[in-house]
Amino acid sequence: MKLRLAALIIIAGILFFFNLGATSLWDPDEPRQAIMAREMMDRGDYIRPYLNGVPYLEKPPFYSWMIMAAAKASGTLDEFASRAPSALAALLLVVITFLLGCRLGDERAGFLSGLVLATNYQFLSNARESVMDMTFAFFIGLSIYLAFVSLEKDKRLSFALSLIPGAFAILTKGPAGLVIPVGVIFVYLIFKRRLKRYFVPLVLGSILATAIASIWFLLAGESYIREFILHQNVTRYTNAFDHIESPFYYFHKLFFNFMPWSLFLPFALYGAWRRRYLLPLLWFVMIFLFFEFSQSKRAIYLLSAYPALALMTGLYLRDAWETLVARGWTNLLLKTLAGLFILIPVGAIVAVHVLPEADVAVFREGPKSLYVYLSILFLAGTGFLVTLFKRKQDLALSCFLFFLVFTGFFYSAYYMPLVDRTSKSLTLITDPLGEYKKTKKIYTFGFNSAGIIFYIGKPITMLRDIKEIKEDERDILLIVEEKPTMHLRETLEKSFVPVKRVKYEKDQYIFYVRKNG
């Protein structure tokens, strides 16, 4: 067990932490978290979050506290410190998934479940981003794991205490952090016919977790309670004011975001039902239904269900992989997948040399190590295909897993840093500002960007109407996005002169100063 767990921690640690600070913080969520942590430290107010100098009432401060702790440990509040809490939460959640897999099946099931969690697209991406959803998912997963272990050992006191992580989930993102694990555990107790014995500990644990979380709300004040609880949670859930999607939104999002493991998911769900793997099945169904009934929908909301999906998939692979490789039609499907794995690196190399220069210039001019990465992926895909032909079950699974792990490594070691420094980094806008960052009051018009605030290092004013600065006689700098403001160019250039133009993503940004500035 120790060997498999150590291997899993090393693999997931590399996937989540390698090059973690090599890319800039991307709008909109990442820099927002870092700004709140920095403003807390600058103000010395660790209770009330601020964003761009204004009280931020939408989320509690726990993730900001974690960023501050990481910044203290590393010595500076930078990209690594901002993302480290999310990466650590992801790593711990992989460990929890492994431990649950061992309890529900065996070490092999635990190891496969952990790898499934670490290598699906959504989880791997979010593990490397400064987003509170990963720590939110961790605390939910920790509560469910501790409750399950307590039930196995028939420990009512530890069962009640298992809900304490729900308090930190509340302080990370909201009341759903307690509602979800309590709901999952409650339904699980009904199915296991143990509700009568554990109902009181469940209630007491819920009260204790709520009391712990309430301390911050009492200290923060009525405005935070009113905005956060009533508007950001109750109203958003029942009568959404943003992120409004169709009832089928989560079905296609889950399929694409859990790739490549979503290919096995229908069989894994059926297998979990047939073999009565109740905990992960109820865990997933409860979370899916909870957010499906919400009027506000985002793909990342389902992140707390991913450990359950990984468990069901890992258990299914443990139970069915040999049959999948041995049986004719499933072996053919796996060979098709292996063929796709081979075509991906080959197609990438062809695309780099065939597509128009404007579309692939970043890769043509990038490091030549691209061809090394793609060659390794080609060999892994080929190995997967050959072992399927030879019906070598364990070797085929090893090649399959290696392909996915190395794809994740390629994503963090090559792809993301290259895309960041050529088109996605907000430093492409802020670095050319030079001394303007220090000497001028800065405004933006036509766009909002928390990233610009973070990299400038001070609050900026985001204009809704260009008339707002007509009365401001100070020495100012105005940053505008070119396309949305084309119709205002004549008006702008009556009072301002363009001093620099920079490219960010697919648009141009123009820096204006006053004609007498």
Each model region followed by its residue ranges:
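Membrane-embedded architecture of ER/inner-membrane glycosylation machinery
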Residues: 160, 271-517
